[in-house]
């Protein structure tokens, strides 16, 4: 048996924080007699259980400065030797070197024991049938002295956890604690708010208009133990969203590095997202698979190998960002108002560990879910007479949105801007499922016996409080304002219902005098009272002047 002392200063620092285990050094003084077993504890929350494979057996004692000294190295088993040598030879160790001492010294030279090499070594050990010892996280276990490769048990990796690169630990002497470090992928969802061309957690939109959603994933840096890396977005849409355009509109992009934003494509105030990737982003749509469930409620987007998409392991070492953009408009069954909204939820499936089978679903675990929400509103416009505020039927109105489309009788929008609507017996016209913004109203024809107003007047729906960090924090405030002779009456954010009136004067009534512009209305009648008082006051002054003038003439 080889009596040399073996030193492995890099076996621990590179792969994990090892409390109570430091570099192995040559002894400078007499040491305590070695024992046959040592205690090890795997702490942290990476996984709940681990498999420990012994590579080398050794006599281990504590040295100075918390170092450990290993002597009398030997292969722990034939299976360990047969699994390790091919891996080391393929990694660059001369094929003429086959002894345990040569293998140990090569591993300790020039930091050969990388996380990628340790992962490959673990794969060979797992496939060789080598015997392992099961370890429970947080519980001390007694192992034979020597070098052990600690591998997270894939079956014990739960939601929000991830297996790390294997950890090489020297067991013996004083108790050893190892703490695997792992960062898990993250996922987020946003929806495009067209009024400011920005991705937000909440937005409002017109029913049936294109509505773009963005899924974004962050793959952390340092995942060097993986040969391939695939992620899968799993999206669940509310009943108020139309899934028919998802597959055709889906675009997927990737960028190197875990740090940075997610602006993979341009956005416009027309409510559309571009398709050309921004600088630093690569379109990988052709490498991805989108599958929409038959019921249209869920769909998945599975990427190809992100390591290959980024050009290799060196680029992937810094992590990655993945963005998926798709179109899912609000449909006719959507919720109106803020009481429920129309939520859209996503979570990310990612490989359990470097050893997981990524060909199916079993090798993946998942992140917590994230969501975004879309809202829409209803505006009821009632035609009323100034003589008693009674509803008027038969008014022909042109109602145009901020894209130049006009409302048609069936509730759709005419892109040519030629459609009109006519008020019914209740005097009402309802703009159902509309985005916030300005609507322009014209009156081509007034009801019989009434005078139509000239020109165009606007009614503005405003939704504030949509730009929030989380959907749960969204408390949109809904208001309506209008230009005379339109009048804003009420706004109920919970139901999304807004009320406004259009006031007509009877034919033959002198038009009211305006002094520039149109007075905005919020439903407060005080301004009308003030205006009436002013008119009455002006009339009294005129009468007084006439009386005075008339009296003078009589006197002459």
Q: Language-model features: where?
A:
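Solvent-exposed loop/turn and edge beta-strand elements of beta-rich ligand-binding domains
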Residues: 1-556
């Amino acid at each position: 048996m080889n009596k040399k002392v073996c030193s492995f200063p890099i076996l621990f620092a590179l792969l994990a924080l090892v409390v109570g285990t430091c570099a192995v050094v040559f002894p400078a003084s007499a040491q305590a007699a070695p024992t046959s077993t040592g205690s090890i504890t795997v702490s942290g929350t990476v996984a709940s259980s681990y498999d420990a494979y012994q590579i080398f057996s050794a006599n281990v004692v504590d040295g100075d400065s918390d170092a450990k000294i290993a002597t009398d190295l030997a292969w722990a088993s034939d299976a360990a030797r047969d699994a390790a040598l091919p891996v080391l030879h393929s990694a660059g160790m001369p094929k003429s070197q086959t002894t345990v001492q040569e293998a140990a010294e090569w591993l300790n030279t020039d930091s050969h024991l990388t996380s990628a090499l340790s992962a490959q070594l673990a794969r060979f050990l797992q496939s060789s049938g080598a015997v392992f010892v099961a370890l429970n996280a947080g519980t001390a276990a007694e192992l034979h002295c020597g070098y052990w490769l600690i591998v997270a048990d894939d079956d014990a990796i739960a939601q929000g956890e991830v297996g790390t690169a294997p950890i090489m630990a020297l067991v013996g002497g004083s108790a050893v604690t190892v703490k695997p470090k792992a960062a898990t992928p993250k996922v987020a969802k946003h929806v495009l708010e067209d009024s400011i061309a920005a991705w937000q957690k909440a937005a409002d939109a017109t029913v049936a208009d294109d509505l773009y959603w963005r899924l974004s994933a962050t793959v952390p840096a340092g995942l060097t133990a993986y040969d391939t890396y695939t992620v899968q977005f799993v999206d669940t849409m509310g009943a108020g969203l139309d899934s028919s355009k998802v597959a055709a509109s889906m675009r997927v992009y990737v960028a190197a590095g875990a740090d940075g934003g997610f602006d993979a494509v341009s956005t416009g105030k027309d409510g559309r997202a571009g398709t050309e990737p921004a600088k630093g982003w690569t379109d990988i749509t052709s490498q991805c698979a989108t599958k929409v469930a038959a019921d249209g409620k869920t769909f998945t987007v599975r990427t190809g190998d992100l390591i290959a998409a980024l050009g290799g392991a060196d680029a992937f070492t810094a992590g990655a960002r993945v963005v998926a953009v798709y179109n899912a408009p609000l449909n006719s069954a959507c919720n109106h108002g803020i009481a429920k909204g129309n939520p859209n939820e996503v979570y990310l499936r990612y490989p359990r560990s470097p050893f997981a089978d990524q060909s199916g679903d079993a090798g993946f675990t998942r992140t917590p879910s994230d969501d975004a929400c879309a809202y829409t509103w209803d505006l009821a416009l009632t035609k009323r007479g100034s003589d008693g505020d009674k509803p008027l039927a038969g008014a022909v109105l042109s109602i145009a949105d901020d894209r130049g489309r006009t409302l048609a009788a069936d509730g759709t929008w005419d892109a040519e801007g030629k459609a009109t609507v006519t008020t019914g017996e209740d005097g009402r016209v309802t703009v159902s499922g509309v985005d916030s913004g300005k609507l322009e109203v014209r009156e081509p024809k007034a009801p019989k016996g009434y005078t139509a107003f000239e020109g165009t007047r606007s009614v503005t729906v405003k939704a504030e409080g949509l730009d929030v960090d989380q959907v749960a924090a969204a408390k949109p405030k809904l208001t309506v304002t209008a230009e005379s002779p339109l009048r804003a009456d009420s706004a109920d954010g919970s139901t999304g219902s807004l009320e406004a009136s259009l006031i007509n004067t009877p034919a033959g009534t002198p038009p009211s005098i305006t002094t520039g512009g149109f007075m905005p209305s919020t439903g407060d009648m005080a301004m009308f009272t003030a205006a009436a008082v002013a008119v009455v006051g002006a009339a009294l002054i005129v009468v007084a002047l006439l009386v005075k003038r008339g009296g003078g003439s009589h006197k002459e």
